[in-house]
């Protein structure tokens, strides 16, 4: 079958043509218009026949693949220094195909799949004439082709600036690149295999130096700073990049689609589909997933519930640039998914192995192979993309980006979130076992993305907070239902709970196994529609039986159950436990982060990490105010309501938490003996926290006020916006009616409230809304009281006068 993308048949290829070894550019980039004889022409077979002479490269395109879709994936082999992309990362991806033109030329088109219709439908003709695919290149056939093939010259196609095989215009602008320099650009090699052809090209671009201005760059002290400046371009006036383009033949018959369902979190692709029987255009959305198929003799076994091995398992290779001590943990992070695939009916469906460095027929850039690429980057992150067939969602391969500095990220998370309960976290450099464990969980998370899974930020909300402290329960069940959440580590656990790493680390868990079952269990239905109706019933049954399988989305829709970095079903309770641990950690930071000759850089970094963690807790709690629960459901579930307001008592508890932990000065963050080794203005960190919460995008957001107003119209028991604003101002301005002195922190809080409220009232987004009206009335009430306020403290008196004037000036505009 054409699916066998992982086969390792011998490559047919070679290096640069004679006279162009290694990185040596051609002596002459011009192409003669005369037809040259090519007695020295050499030829190799593969997906395309590939021929070369001293000057040019040729493809021989077999007639049987004309019209067949080919996925062209371009990656950096090596990139210029000083940019945020690295060798191995994807540059571009396009579906292309060859076809014969009426004038005899061979055309290369890009297939822009946005609309479709079956060819046996009358409407197919209308779809075809309204979806002309762009011609990327036109080739005059060359002489000497084998029978049943067309020979074309492809030198300029790859050495030039053909976008589908290179950087797009936006990326070039971000690098400030100009035109390709033909005299310093050349094809390094072309290798051809049975179902793919690999082209490696060195390209040199002219450089358009940015104008001096704000931003980073090589200006140096006192010198001009250049925004988006590329060091090589600034120093040499040109930028050289090496690309590899994999041209992979896609299956002639696309894999059967599995239609997208918002109740299970998968990445999806789609297009608009037309048919003769329609009365409205159908939007087809289908998930991205690998093709796993049983051998014919195993199909009945699988239908009976027996585990079977797929014809072609999912294999990830570990980049040989990966430090040896981390390779076993990256491999384990992949292999941990095997249990999930067993729930879907497969055994030995997925595994990882080290890259066979002694195999000359394998390339890290080859799109037949999935690789965890190790990137020498200061970026503290990792990511898991996939390359898929846009017709069906079939994942072809993935190159996971693993940044070297991700270890800094997991170190800081673990010390801040688990340092109070795990002594292993209390040092700068972790031992290999602990760091390996942390790498393993990140590996599993990123592999999940490459299997098609989206983040499930709601999974952690399915665990009651108190169970996070129950040693037996949490060590057996885990602190979050999904590795695809940003749940990190169990920061709720207290030292006296004696919870081990089994209850502290995330793991592949119930939701992940369910999601893999949904994506990968064969149903053997003939059509995507029949398959979808089957899964609709299964989803309803499973979620009713086990609410822990809920997919909560990716934290972007104002549902406080689905947030990043949170734990448990009660943000207030979880955050209170988290703060208790932060108070234990913050005093120990210097002792845990001792490094000879360090100028407090390590201490400063970890102190800032504690502040950031506290900021997350404030965000988790404030999201409940004006939030709503979102429950996706189908028509067969009439007892479920999609949008529900957060209960009033939960919102009021959230506001009380903010009053106790933010509106009142959190002195524990600054009352540490080393604070003046870090800053001469400790309260500035606290002011930043205030700015994040008391803002036009958080507590005073017009969308939040309007949601409260809308829900109050239909549910009198819900939290009314006027009640909310009264509660909020009563907390923020509690001194106003009592004549008490106001300290500097509280004065800042009050000024911030007024500034944010004025910003909202004056915004166009708030115009004509009830939220603006209520906030305007609140400001007027504050102004009236501030103008009459009395205080024996001169600073407080001046403060109230300034508040009254600020509001008055704003209202007069």
Question: Locations of the language-model features?
Answer:
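Auxiliary tRNA-acceptor-end handling modules of aminoacyl-tRNA synthetases
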Residues: 14-57, 61-322, 340, 344, ...
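Bacterial N-terminal signal peptides
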Residues: 1-8
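Extended catalytic-interface subdomain
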Residues: 383, 388, 394-402, 443-451, ...
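Sec-exported extracytoplasmic/periplasmic mature domains
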Residues: 335-346, 448-449, 453, 489, ...
